[in-house]
């Protein structure tokens, strides 16, 4: 019954949005600020991604690659209304088998933000322990070696050895696909607002090196894990020549690519996810200062 109610509410939000003219008014507003719809997820079930992309494509949205997004940002190509940008965090296992065929069918490019150490370990540290200990939220402030020591201890005690993330080989194959781009997500999925600037910079540089070695291409974007950073960190990342991808709407006017964290849910139905997308209308601002 709950599922039916959620589906009905989601359908109502989506339908009323389209029929009420809100869609036209919001798209007109996009024409004034050059915004791009940001569709963002982690590890969606294939049917979830398929239904959401299909809904958007059928309503006239055209998904652009990171190269195209940066061309618009830099004024090398004109912005077009109903433009969208699809991104995924972390690079979860099964992407190649489960999600790539959907991208190919709709010809939708996607950007995956990768933390190489987490790829090597096979897990995102928060996801692997949050159900096993109530102490995990205190570990954001710890340096990587101490944090991993605590994570490994909890996993060993709970026999938590299942791989969650795609391995290096899968990511390398994905990076060679014309629809897929890999970008920087720090080296250890670091909380950039909890650790010193120098540590964040070191992780950014190490990720640049590793991903260039894996893929033959040096990343241009860096997405902050957990969506947080400090002003000092943000400035330091820019000085490296990287373009920050931020979760803070306020940063959209600071020369970064502001990627709102009102993401679609990995396991929700179509109309629930359409409701999430339309309520917040996440966007990236491509008119940079």
Regions found by a protein language model. Name each.
Residues 92-93, 188:
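Short, glycine/acidic-enriched loop or turn micro-motifs at the edges of active sites
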């Amino acid at each position: 019954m709950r599922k039916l109610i959620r589906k009905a509410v989601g359908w109502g939000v989506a339908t009323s949005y389209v029929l009420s003219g809100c869609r036209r008014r919001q798209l007109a507003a996009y024409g004034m600020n050059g915004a791009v719809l940001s569709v963002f997820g982690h590890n969606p079930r294939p049917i979830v991604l398929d239904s959401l992309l299909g809904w958007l494509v059928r309503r006239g949205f055209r998904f652009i690659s990171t190269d195209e997004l940066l061309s618009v940002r830099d004024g090398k190509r004109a912005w077009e209304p109903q433009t969208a940008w699809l991104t995924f965090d972390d690079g979860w296992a099964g992407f190649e088998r489960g999600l790539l065929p959907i991208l190919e069918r709709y010809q939708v490019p996607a950007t995956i933000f990768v933390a190489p150490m987490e790829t090597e370990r096979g897990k995102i540290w928060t996801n692997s322990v949050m159900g096993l200990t109530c102490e995990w939220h205190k570990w954001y402030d710890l340096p990587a070696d101490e944090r991993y020591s605590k994570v490994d201890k909890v996993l060993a005690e709970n026999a938590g050895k299942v791989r969650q993330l795609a391995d290096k080989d899968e990511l390398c194959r994905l990076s060679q696909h014309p629809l897929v781009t890999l970008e920087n997500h720090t080296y250890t999925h670091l909380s950039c607002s909890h650790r010193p600037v120098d540590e964040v910079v070191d992780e950014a540089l190490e990720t640049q090196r590793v991903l260039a070695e894996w893929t033959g291409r040096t990343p241009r974007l860096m997405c902050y894990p957990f969506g947080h950073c400090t002003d000092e960190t943000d400035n330091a990342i820019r000085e490296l020549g990287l373009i920050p991808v931020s979760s803070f709407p306020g940063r959209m006017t600071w020369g970064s690519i502001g990627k709102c964290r009102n993401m679609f849910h990995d396991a929700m139905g179509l109309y629930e996810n359409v409701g999430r997308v339309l309520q917040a209308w996440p966007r990236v601002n491509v008119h940079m200062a």
